[in-house]
Amino acid sequence: MKVSNLISTITIASALCLSLTNALVFSPCDKIQSLVKEYFDETIVDEMMCIAYNEAINPKSDSIGLWNLKKEHCNTVCKSICNSEIDLADIKLNTQCAEMVYLEFGFNGWDSYNNGLCKDSWGFCNTQNELRQHGSHSSTSRDSSSSSSRDSTGTGYSSSGSGTSGSGSNSGQTGHFIPGQSGHGLN
């Protein structure tokens, strides 16, 4: 095979792979919502979405994963599915363990709920999905700019970002998961 044919084949294969990977784009809200609906009763979906949203990034915590679970849970509540804290890095096992924590402690298993961040009706992801459907917010294009804000629940959320470099800024209460921002492990 000639080098030019090999390069053409690689180029076509790469373009095909890129088009397939761009065919389905899920927001972090979609990913979290899918996990929540798989493991939790539908009556608590909003609360668990809020807990995941607020617990995913907590720079002051040594807890693990989307649900910010304590490593001790592997020896107690989650011992049937978890052998070590490393297991909690698996998002599905982390969510299964979160379900067990909820069954054992209820919402009191999470500081974000105890601090009042998730006690009121919370529909941030529903709002983001509505904005996307109506064209007011685009998270599917890598070259788009976006800006959104929410302050009705007192969390002071606001963010803005643009471009393919992932640059942007957010302001508001620290320690909150900001959909679309890097660093939360859901991109």
Swiss-Prot record:
Organism the protein comes from: Dictyostelium discoideum
Active site at E55
The record's keywords, sorted A to Z, are: Disulfide bond, Signal
Signal sequence range: 1-23
Query: Which region ranges are annotated with the description Disordered?
Result: 133-187
Identify its protein family.
Answer: Belongs to the glycosyl hydrolase 22 family.
Which Cys pairs does UniProt list as disulfide-bonded?
A: C50-C125, C74-C82, C78-C97
Lineage, highest ranks first:
Eukaryota, Amoebozoa, Evosea, Eumycetozoa, Dictyostelia
Q: What is this protein called?
A: Lysozyme C-like protein DDB_G0288143
State where composition is biased (Low complexity). Answer: 136-175
